[in-house]
Amino acid sequence: MDDAPTTKPLTLERALGRVFAELRESRGLKQVDVSVATGYVERTVGMVERGEKSPTLRTMENFAAFYGVPLETIIVKAKQLRQASMTPKGQHA
């Protein structure tokens, strides 16, 4: 039996993007809503959420403030997602 993960481990950028996308979706918002509220162009919001663009600390702070979530919480969640993506199925980190 192969214990290797079936998918490639998440990069930190992709993990952060997933957290930001989950925050947006859980609030019933679209990327354009985040764009208008934060001043970032919609394309940038999408690229960050897909992990195609590494957000600056300022961008992460602005998104965190918009969602009303401490940046530390977002970083911890992203690290947990990333770690889970590197853990073989059936095992716990």
Feature map (PLM): residue ranges:
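A short, Lys/Arg-rich alpha-helix, primarily the initiator
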Residues: 1-26
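DNA major-groove recognition helix of helix-turn-helix/homeodomain DNA-binding modules
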Residues: 5, 39, 58-73
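Conserved hydrophobic/aromatic packing and binding residues within compact polymer-binding modules
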Residues: 20, 34-35, 45-48, 74
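Short, charged recognition helix plus adjacent turn
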Residues: 2-5, 65, 75-93
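Short basic helix-loop element that most often maps to the first helix and adjoining turn
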Residues: 18-37, 62, 89-90
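Recognition helix of helix-turn-helix/homeodomain-like DNA-binding domains
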Residues: 39-55
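Helix-turn-helix/winged-helix DNA-binding modules
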Residues: 15, 26, 52-55, 66
